[in-house]
UniProtKB/Swiss-Prot annotation:
Belongs to the bacterial ribosomal protein bL12 family. It holds the Pfam family Ribosomal_L12. GO terms for molecular function: mRNA binding; structural constituent of ribosome. InterPro entries: Ribosomal_bL12, Ribosomal_bL12_C, Ribosomal_bL12_C/ClpS-like, Ribosomal_bL12_oligo, Ribosomal_bL12_oligo_N_sf. This is Large ribosomal subunit protein bL12. It comes from the Bacteria. Keywords: Ribonucleoprotein, Ribosomal protein. NCBIfam families: L12 (TIGR00855). One of its GO terms (cellular component) is cytosolic large ribosomal subunit. It comes from Prochlorococcus marinus subsp. pastoris (strain CCMP1986 / NIES-2087 / MED4). GO terms for biological process: translation. The keyword Repressor does not apply.
Amino acid sequence: MTAKTEEILDSLKSLSLLEASELVKQIEEAFGVSAAASAGVVMAAPGAGGGDGDGGAAEEKTEFDVILESFDAAAKIKVLKVVRNATGLGLGDAKALVESAPKTVKEGIAKADAETLKKEIEEAGGKVTLK
């Protein structure tokens, strides 16, 4: 590898999950590509087959985004702990995410997992929506 590519790789290794996610979105926009294009084709095929057999199944959403809308100031630490556990973010990144609400906590997760996370955040004092 060249020194330039090694430097880029080292920079990428130091990114948090939130920063890496934002980087992927920026790359997708800048180059007009999708990082999940091949996985989307694999995922779409079973869904399309199920949709042909049952029209209702095609309309049911299977992946959800968990969005922290707001939180009680007194419960900030509790919400922060739940967000850290769910995302694997470091303290600083999780704090930044919580303080910048409304903000997406997790994207594209299963309905059951999304509902569980929503319940945990709400019990800690946050207000959450699923999209």
